[in-house]
Amino acid sequence: MNKTITALAIIMASFAANASVLPETPVPFKSGTGAIDNDTVYIGLGSAGTAWYKLDTQAKDKKWTALAAFPGGPRDQATSAFIDGNLYVFGGIGKNSEGLTQVFNDVHKYNPKTNSWVKLMSHAPMGMAGHVTFVHNGKAYVTGGVNQNIFNGYFEDLNEAGKDSTAVDKINAYYFDKKAEDYFFNKFLLSFDPSTQQWSYAGESPWYGTAGAAVVNKGDKTWLINGEAKPGLRTDAVFELDFTGNNLKWNKLAPVSSPDGVAGGFAGISNDSLIFAGGAGFKGSRENYQNGKNYAHEGLKKSYSTDIHLWHNGKWDKSGELSQGRAYGVSLPWNNSLLIIGGETAGGKAVTDSVFISVKDNKVTVQN
């Protein structure tokens, strides 16, 4: 079996000791997806539309190379993973044939050897947007994400309302003014076997599903960090999935980014240190929600975190800062550290740069 790596998995491959942050992305890049296979980084979708690019991190002249365009149309919030030398792309949010925004549950496969895409005859049993994907023992695992029916219905209503501002305000109030459990975010864990292209039930969270969580895995353990508990309301929760002994166990670790939490953060591991950085949220939303205001982020401004946290001795410590707050980029394992590609900053501005975060002796180094 070829080396299998997800967009957020940890790789211990040996890279050059003087590896630098990558060249700027060909276009401002946010809300897309990415993966790394051995020495080559792949990114695409999101603000790049249907475009995909690759970059050989070992090349002397590092540059992004355009690949065949994604055949499924522009997508936000898709996820991707490499398994046995092929890149798999799961779901996302885009336009259907009628031009309506919707959540997809499909799977596409990219073959790097032929630079070609194929849509698989495979559909997840639920929509995939805001979900996370990781690989364990040759299978892709998916959990979290919004409810497909509720999300699609919201955008169908907005489309029918058109420019009627009164109707739009009513739709938004109805959509956001509900309790977290009424959004039915996905708390199931699904597995996808690329050899059969079949989906299976693999378990479920004893707590609740999230959307826009950060995910990272190493060995038999996977961590889901923060994310939305409902539209506009984040959680500071951290969940650990432990596959040790082939018996999946769900654990809840100490919270981080408290009290409001963030979504779209970045996670990785460097020298066995678990890293969580960045993300976006609404300060004060958790207090509003606890005080009975379901539309918890109404009137609040989205803020972007600069914080870098390390998991150490059973708790999170703020151990550094990004040069600017950012969220909704791609996290990749690179050179035994965390590589962040793109993302958005204040005002939702997509960026082209990358950030490299490494840890040694519990000390954080940030390279821009």
Curated annotation (Swiss-Prot):
Gene Ontology terms for molecular function: racemase and epimerase activity, acting on carbohydrates and derivatives
Gene: nanM
Entry's family note: Belongs to the NanM family.
Record's keyword annotation contains Isomerase: yes
Keyword field: Carbohydrate metabolism, Isomerase, Kelch repeat, Periplasm, Repeat, Signal
HAMAP family per UniProt: NanM (MF_01195)
Protein name: N-acetylneuraminate epimerase
Organism of derivation: Escherichia coli O139:H28 (strain E24377A / ETEC)
Annotated compartments: Periplasm
A Pfam family the protein falls into: NANM
